[in-house]
Amino acid sequence: MPKGFLVKRNKKAALVSYRIRTDEDGGPTPECPIAQIALSSPAPSASKPDSILLAFPSAGAEAPVPVHKPVQFGNPEAVYQALYSPTRPVSKDHDRKYFERSLNLGSPISAESFPTPASLTSLDHHLLFAPVDLKIGTSNSNRSGTASGAHAPAIQTGAKRPSADAAERKVSSKSAKKPKAIRKLNFEDEVTTSPVLGLKIKEGPVDLKPRPSSGGTNKPLGEFICQLCKEEYSDPFSLAQHKCSRIVRVEYRCPECEKVFSCPANLASHRRWHKPRVQSAPKQALQPAKPFPEELRAEFPSDRDTPSPGLSESGSEDGLYDCQHCGKRFKRQAYLRKHILGHQALQNQILGEAFRSAESPDAMPSEDRQSPAPLNLSPADCLTCPACGEKLPNRASLERHLRLLHDDAQAFPCKFCPATFYSSPGLTRHINKCHPTENRQVILLQMPVRNAC
């Protein structure tokens, strides 16, 4: 903002205390002639401005230089004619008009507000002409604070314009922050070692000999070059079909189901499905069961005459796993294994009861004494499961069997073997796998016989 920007430029401007800032710090400060006139001569009359103007240069030359800078009153334009604005007039007539305006106290407002220096007492003179800075923190205020340290303490505040040292400090701090932004843009290590991509880039061989630059006409334009192995191609299609030798596919294979993953986190979450929750086993299961004699196992054939196929690791055609005992379907192989363990526990329990009843036939009731074999033999007094047709020795075993294995499900028995399934697709898959020849014969028998022509 230029100097004197907010000064009102009317004809009857009130006198304002003003201190002009100089550019050179060590140079002497020009003195205000109005203050010298107020100190050395009586109050001038408004009718003699010419005598004041004539006495102005002699008074400035003969007056002694005070210790502290005199206070400048009035409009600064009336004292200094060489201001920074290029449009300001600098003629003597202009100075004369401003001196007349500044010394003319004919107005009652200005006469009451600012009396002449001759009418002031010594105390009023010290109070009125005390050194006051209107601009805090400038170079003049610093010099006046050192010169008049006995009157008032120096006011130290931040400068309005930053110094050269502060500017240099800002530039150096900005230049020091630039390497941090450059360091954030380095993502090469993350790309080459990221496990989520499933790829790994091997380190390239160090070529001590530079590649010879072929100056022939068959040299490609350099647009289709593999950035890893530096092989050049004539068209983008060849570059797209190129399999770089530095790119290696990383595979993480599940040891239980041989499923392949490209990320180790996915493999870890997949392996949690293979670990079923450990349920609280009953007290009877905690006790070690007695081994079933091999003679009884040989005497008791399987409940199915046809051999059952083993469990397929990949599951069925629609991605489900079927239980060969009851025909239930499961989405995961771990669920099927857990379900089969329940079958085995129940079968071991029934075999144990049969073994104990065979050892002590006198303790058994008469109805159970006639049917020592609960699973494979089918005497008239054995209880048959209505869902799967399994033979059970007593009612308690039948109720336990129904509670554990059957939840009011519809049974689909096989026509060729005693196996029973609880879904029509399960029975169809069983017939296609275990009885393909019998199924073909049935189809042929159901076809109508054509008469020969």
Swiss-Prot record:
Biased composition (Basic and acidic residues): 162-171
Name of the coding gene: insm1b
Protein name (database record): Insulinoma-associated protein 1b
Family: Belongs to the INSM1 family.
Keywords assigned: Developmental protein, Differentiation, DNA-binding, Metal-binding, Neurogenesis, Nucleus, Repeat, Transcription, Transcription regulation, Zinc, Zinc-finger
Signal peptide feature range: none
Zinc finger map (C2H2-type): 252-274, 321-343, 383-406, 412-435
Main location: nucleus
Intrachain disulfide bonds: none
